[in-house]
Amino acid sequence: MKVVAFNGSPRKDGNTATLLHVALSELESQGIETELVHLKGPISGCIACFKCHEKLDGKCALDKDIINECIEKMAGADGIILGSPTYFSDLTPELKALIDRSGFVGKANGDMFKRKVGAAVVAVRRAGAIHVFDSINHFFLINQMVIPGSSYWNIGMGLAEKDVERDPEGMQTMRVLGQNMGWLMKKLKE
């Protein structure tokens, strides 16, 4: 089994990446292969050209960024984690582009993410995290994915790099998320 996580932060080693590493470590301790992908830009948003509905090749017609590589990784994984910091009470444009473009491609190609396990991870300084968490979970639910819970919402608090490490509840929430995601993936394979 494999989980691929996407870091939607422009900071490769910031708080979002820190939270993702904690969840991925728990999955690895259960023998699950993991991969962390940094959504490096520039990344274009969906232009609603609907070429993915015409070609039906599992790819977005926009091919000058990493989104098609990400879609391929998502299709090949058993679990997907989408992580984002909270910017003005919303997710980053890089993650939004991945959600929109992979969502269109997935729907056009036979619901290619159906029954995969999906988890949202959100870094926040103060407010807006629930909106980001909800937006990511809507993507999972629209794509008929299964969402594991944790001991609280999958949120870590901090501003400066590595600040989330001083949020014990946030770190514990990520550990429990990784444990529950691994358990759920194994149950779905039985």
PLM features: residue spans?
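N-terminal beta1-alpha1-beta2 submodule of the flavodoxin-like/Rossmannoid cofactor-binding fold
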Residues: M1-A108, G158-E190
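Short, glycine-/small-residue-rich phosphate/pyrophosphate-handling segment
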Residues: P93-E94, A108-Y152, Q172
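Short, solvent-exposed aromatic-acidic interface loops
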Residues: N154-G156
